[in-house]
Amino acid sequence: MKKLLLAAVLALTTGMAFAQGAANSKKGAPAAAPSAEEQTIRARLEQTFNLKPSKVSPTPFGWYEIIVDAEVYYVDPQANYVFNGSVIDTRTRQNLTQARKDDLMKVDYAKLPLDQAVRIRVGKGTRQFVTFEDPNCGFCRKLHNDLKGLTDYTLYIFLYPILSPDSTEKAKGIWCARDRAATWNALMLEGKAPPAAPADCKHPLEANLQLGRKLGVNGTPTLIFQDGSRMPGASSVEAIEQRFAAAKK
């Protein structure tokens, strides 16, 4: 379905979207959208693409923002054109689309089931964050090597075996080990494979996979901070420190 939607995007160029935004931004904030326009948009999208947006909202540049499966698109009031891409406020240089996506992808940190995660504490451990990681993830190993330069934190690792069947076996071995944190670090930092898990060992791997899918975690590592923001990939210590600082505000 997304391919169909992207095909419709070809009917509108990025330049046209920016021009439309510049022209309408001079008019100030839009008036309350007539319900008829929203009904037209919803009906047209459902009829053409079989899409049911979770939200349809007016924008400052005259078009409508539609949310479909945490993705952001834009349509004109008659739903004749669909635009998929970044809209930039030329006055502030802010990427309005990315800001909206970041907001949509925020996680309720307080509701994360941290009892399903491997806990690693460094120093006093006052600063917290969460990762979703696969035992066979090369970027995860890079992340943990970089974390040697980070102090005073508690990391909760949701074992998220999505790369191979072997990932599942290793994840079981880590969770069922006597010292989960040490076993994880031995794998990430030294390349030591975890011991095989006992056949009767209970683990939260399926629950972790369901949680990750619900949160839209598509790759490892994915980092989540206490303010609900997330950061994909092997992030630098500097970037993590910046997120810690932002989470305090």
Give residue ranges: language-model regions.
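Conserved NTP-binding/hydrolysis module of P-loop NTPases
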Residues: 174-176
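Extracytoplasmic thiol/disulfide redox context detector
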Residues: 2-7, 15-172, 186-189, 197-220, ...
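Short strand-coil-strand connectors
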Residues: 69, 226-227
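Acidic-aromatic/histidine active-site loop/patch
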Residues: 192
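Conserved, helical-rich catalytic subdomain that frames metal- and/or nucleotide-binding sites
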Residues: 178-181, 185
